[in-house]
């Protein structure tokens, strides 16, 4: 293992424990952004005073080590950032060194990972010459695992006292983080996080797209709409392309046209156009659009899509062993 890097007061270490596809995307966005900041003589004043510049990624197998190194090493600039990719046997040492720990493992693996031998000491705030090290930040992107779930594991399974608990955050990015177009939802907490932590979290997840903060009781619905929603919209896009192919369009062109049309509609909504107004603007009297829309309404597309979001919300809550409210008996 390489020797730990010496950090300045403006440099943090971030460990991704269980660095799969999402972890790679997040680190890719951060590393690329750090390189851009280094090339800009006047970086934005909105950047937090301390940024993660040293990174440790842990994975389960040697082949995964090679995969992560292949994806991320080209983005590392020696004068700007450092990266080490280790096997998961190094989870404890990675956590000990890190200021920020991102849990990228499967939800069912969280307890076992955090309760590993030595993890209690790795996560405990150390006191040296009368000065306490800052609290670590644990960010979970594990579907269905709540902040209380994580805090319970840290207290009961890891054995940390209330005074030594890290700052625990739940965030839910989506697969579009790969192209920096994620919609990430971060769980608000009570009492609120310190401003410095909020600024840091926002900066991290804005490297891969947009960020919003919402209360914990909405997180499973956010998982459904933002994470599962990618698949829902892909199905609608595929269906639209199928219709075009049925009417004679080549498959490749139909896929491209459907994707670009969906992107255009999304862009208009993000610019402030209400979806209903957008739909109305395109629906000229006696035209083809209103004819097609009536077929969609007759087929119950609106209700089916809404119910899919509700059902996925229920399943998301079950992933972490929790419950979901306001689903009105959608499961049967």
From Swiss-Prot:
Catalytic activity entry: L-proline + NADP(+) = (S)-1-pyrroline-5-carboxylate + NADPH + 2 H(+); L-proline + NAD(+) = (S)-1-pyrroline-5-carboxylate + NADH + 2 H(+)
MF terms per GO, please?
pyrroline-5-carboxylate reductase activity
Kindly tell me the pathway this chain contributes to.
Answer: Amino-acid biosynthesis; L-proline biosynthesis; L-proline from L-glutamate 5-semialdehyde: step 1/1
Identify the keywords attached in UniProt to this record, alphabetized.
Amino-acid biosynthesis, NADP, Oxidoreductase, Proline biosynthesis
PROSITE patterns assigned? P5CR
Could you state one GO biological process linked to this protein?
L-proline biosynthetic process
What Pfam families does the annotation carry?
F420_oxidored, P5CR_dimer
| Keyword hit for Zinc | no
- Transmembrane region(s): none
Superkingdom to which the source organism belongs: Eukaryota
Q: What is its EC number?
A: 1.5.1.2
Name the protein family.
Answer: Belongs to the pyrroline-5-carboxylate reductase family.
Q: What name has this protein been given in UniProt?
A: Pyrroline-5-carboxylate reductase
Q: Which organism is it from?
A: Neurospora crassa (strain ATCC 24698 / 74-OR23-1A / CBS 708.71 / DSM 1257 / FGSC 987)
The organism's taxonomic lineage, starting at the top: Eukaryota, Fungi, Dikarya, Ascomycota, Pezizomycotina
| Name of encoding gene | pro-1
């Amino acid at each position: 293992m390489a020797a730990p890097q010496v950090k300045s007061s403006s440099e943090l270490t971030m460990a991704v424990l269980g660095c799969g596809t999402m972890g790679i995307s997040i680190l890719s966005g951060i590393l690329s952004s750090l390189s851009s900041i280094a090339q800009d003589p006047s970086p934005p004043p909105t950047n937090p005073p301390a940024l993660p510049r040293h990174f440790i990624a842990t994975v389960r197998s040697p082949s995964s080590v090679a995969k992560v190194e292949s994806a991320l090493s080209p983005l590392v600039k020696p004068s700007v950032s450092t990266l080490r990719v280790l096997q998961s046997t190094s989870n404890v040492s990675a956590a000990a060194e890190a200021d920020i720990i991102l849990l990228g493992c499967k939800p069912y693996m969280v307890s076992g990972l955090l309760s590993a031998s030595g993890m209690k000491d790795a996560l405990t705030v150390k006191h040296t010459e009368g000065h306490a090290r800052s609290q670590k930040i644990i960010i979970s992107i594990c579907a269905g695992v709540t902040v209380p779930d994580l805090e319970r594991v840290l207290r009961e399974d890891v054995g940390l006292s209330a005074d030594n608990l890290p700052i625990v955050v739940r965030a839910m990015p989506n697969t579009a983080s790969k192209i920096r177009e994620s919609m990430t939802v971060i769980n608000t907490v009570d009492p609120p996080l310190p401003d410095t932590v909020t600024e840091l979290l926002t900066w991290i997840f804005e490297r891969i797209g947009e960020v919003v903060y919402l209360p914990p009781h909405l997180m499973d619905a956010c998982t459904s709409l933002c994470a599962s929603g990618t698949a829902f919209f892909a199905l609608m896009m595929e269906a639209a392309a199928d219709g075009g192919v049925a009417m004679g369009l080549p498959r490749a062109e139909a896929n491209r046209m459907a994707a670009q049309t969906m992107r255009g509609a999304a862009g208009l909504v993000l610019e402030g156009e209400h979806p209903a107004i957008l739909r109305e603007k395109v629906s000229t009297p006696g035209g083809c659009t209103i004819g097609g829309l009536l077929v969609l309404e007759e087929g119950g597309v609106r209700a089916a899509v809404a119910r899919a979001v509700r059902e996925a919300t229920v399943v998301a809550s079950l992933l972490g062993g929790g419950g979901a409210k306001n689903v009105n008996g959608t499961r049967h």
